[in-house]
Amino acid sequence: MATNAKHENGESTKGKKKMSAKKRRAKQRARIIIFVVELLVIVVMLVAVLKVFQTTEEVEGPQFAQIDESQIVVNSEVVEKFEESEELKGYWNIALFGVDATDGQIRKNTRSDTIMIASVNQDTGEIRLVSVYRDTYLNLSNDRYNKCNGAYSSGGAEQAMAMLNMNLDLNITDFVTVGYDAVVDCVNGLGGVWIDVDKEEIKHINNYQKSILRDTDIDDELIMVEETGYQLLNGLQAAAYCRIRFTAGNDFKRAERQREVIQAMADQAKQSSLSTLTDTFLQVMNNVYTTIDQKDLQDLLGQIANYSIVGEDGFPQRDKLATENIGACGSCVVPTDLADNVVWLHEFLFGVEDYEVSSTVQECSDQIKADTSPYLNRRSN
């Protein structure tokens, strides 16, 4: 059995250390925020924050997170690599969480329906997005293995970031979380998003619209999608589109749709006026939870156009995963070789060829194989 599993004596994984106080953040913060704006709608609205705060002192902002840095685990070898490697300098990584909560309760006790990693090259302005499939079988950062979306439910953004760092050799300490009603309000505020809808998706968009209206306090008008092709979707329709999973591609296609909507929102935001962004921000801010504070927002204006999304993909890679019922965990996406997937991830995000994974990632990879092989082998026999 791999040594990173938690034993009865409480011994925990080796090769990791707690993240110390954030270093050299002042120069990087503004660019981090700008790329977040490029990535997620809500954050796009943050462009308007400066204007809002300049005109009134009565406006409340988003829920700013005071995170416990001691809970954000970063593998010790990774800390050294990001500080010393020339290839890794100039990058900043952020976690994006979409939670299935619509009443402002977005901090904890809800599973992250969407998990993304956004990596920005601060020298070139290039941004890459990776969806981590929510049912991926990973170490939840406490040496317990289950579907990765359980990390947010158990320990909020701190544990979810720690989970990503531990399994993927990353150094994430910033995040943005949004609820589904923020997506609805944001898309509506931007005037909709342009999406190419196929025949198979129409019925699911309409069914999910009905379920969202039934199960949440969102009171948008139900407008049925009736035609295929490239068309302007409103907020409710776009949120429903993001939730489709029962088509060819299942959750993998669902994650692709979510990235597609993010790109469409970023495109709309770039064409929007400051007044439109301000109005949209006021609509969604109560459903945004983030480490980005008011002071950092002041560097946003006039720089958004310098950043663009140049690549997007999913994790694990389609040729490096399997789907199977893993005991009490239920149906999971299994990275058949986590270490191999992490090697691919670092080449995709940072251009690092033949990346050498940390001992922690290798231990997690070995443990995942030990846990899942009996189930995967049974299927192949």
What feature does the model see in each segment?
Residues 108-112, 142, 151-159, 177-181, ...:
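Soluble non-cytosolic domains of exported or imported proteins
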Residues 150, 154-219, 271, 291-293, ...:
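Amphipathic, coiled-coil-like alpha-helical scaffolding segments used for oligomerization/assembly
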Residues 103-106, 146-154, 169-174, 228, ...:
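Second-shell loop/turn segments in exported
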Residues 97, 103, 135, 163-173, ...:
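Structured segments of extracytoplasmic/periplasmic soluble domains
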Residues 89-92, 110-115, 124-132, 143, ...:
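Extracytoplasmic
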Residues 188-276:
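Flexible, polar/acidic helix-loop-strand segments at domain edges
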Residues 69-84, 91, 140, 287-381:
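C-terminal solvent-exposed extensions
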Residues 3, 16-17, 21-124, 299-305:
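Entry/capping segment at the start of metal-dependent catalytic domains
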